[in-house]
């Protein structure tokens, strides 16, 4: 998936799921399941419930995404 094809949205982490998956509520109210990007995993960036994150969504499946940034 090329970067141009993805949709980036802001959201809040609602719940932590097994295998570094998270339930994220987007700004528009939709709830998606998201996993951590490889660079965040590599640098041991922790994500907790309530964190504000940036999620990349693919236009093909809007129910799954990738967390690419955690706001401070």
Curated annotation (Swiss-Prot):
Family of this protein: Belongs to the IF-1 family.
Entry's localization field: Cytoplasm
Described function: One of the essential components for the initiation of protein synthesis. Stabilizes the binding of IF-2 and IF-3 on the 30S subunit to which N-formylmethionyl-tRNA(fMet) subsequently binds. Helps modulate mRNA selection, yielding the 30S pre-initiation complex (PIC). Upon addition of the 50S ribosomal subunit IF-1, IF-2 and IF-3 are released leaving the mature 70S translation initiation complex.
Residue ranges annotated for the S1-like domain, each copy included: 1-72
Biological source species: Idiomarina loihiensis (strain ATCC BAA-735 / DSM 15497 / L2-TR)
Quaternary structure and partners: Component of the 30S ribosomal translation pre-initiation complex which assembles on the 30S ribosome in the order IF-2 and IF-3, IF-1 and N-formylmethionyl-tRNA(fMet); mRNA recruitment can occur at any time during PIC assembly.
Presence of the UniProt keyword rRNA-binding in the record: yes
GO molecular function per UniProt: ribosome binding; rRNA binding; translation initiation factor activity
Entry's Gene Ontology cellular component terms: cytosol
Protein name as catalogued: Translation initiation factor IF-1
Pfam families, A to Z: eIF-1a
Keyword annotations: Cytoplasm, Initiation factor, Protein biosynthesis, RNA-binding, rRNA-binding
Cytoplasm listed as a keyword: yes
Primary site of residence: cytoplasm
Entry-linked SMART domains: S1
Entries under HAMAP family matching the protein: IF_1 (MF_00075)
Domain of life from the UniProt record: Bacteria
